[in-house]
Amino acid sequence: MTSRLALILLITAFVSTSVLAAEEQPDISGVWVAFSSNPGFVGAVSEPQTAQGKAMVEEYFAQFENHVEPGAWCVAPGMPYTMLTQVSYPIEILQTENRITMLMEYDMQVRRIFMDGRSEPADYPPTRVGYSTGQWEGNTLVVETGLLTEDLDNRWPRTEQTRIMERVYLSTFEKEEVESTGFVSTIADPVSNDVLVFEYSVTDPLLYTEPRNITMYYQRMTDDIFLEYDCPAGNWREALKAANP
């Protein structure tokens, strides 16, 4: 009887601790808009530092003399730049115990951060947003992203060896004391006092001699309505006009 009671108490304590830990996780769900960065907006462009990286980018652009901005062809930038833009495209965060999903109005991109302890799969194809796994360290969400496609015409160029580390945590305007560096922002009259801080560290032995770091600041919004980022429609209409002059 004593052993059974001890077992019940042990299970109860374990369950209570697990529930408490889950309850202590910060609620980062909702709609957020970037309003500032450190370094500032100019710092959102990252040039290769290694001789090999510079040569790779120069060779790429020499091959495509009539280079245009990829965004003009609705090519999504992917990570990390998709999270660094300050053109006031909102992101919506959906938070569950085993997964955090980030929906972006910008190019309608989707990030999935797996929180169930899994490892990066060996047979997963590289993508523009990569493969992200995360865990809570106290009140900080720590995310690692790999399996990224090579993209040399990006504001933050990357190769398949690029790794991105993120530390994400809730804060307030008073604690951060940052000014708006974005194009559009409601920081002058914020709808809430919540600030979501993203600290990024990007490494790539082919491109950089040291980690490239940038911190982004997002403010919580009350309006959860997204507009449709229907980028391909314009290109389709232009193609129809060209085919039927």
Please identify what each model-predicted range represents.
Residues 1-5:
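Positively charged n-region of N-terminal signal peptides that target proteins for export
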Residues 21-245:
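Hydrophobic small-molecule pocket/channel-lining residues, especially in calycin-type beta-barrels
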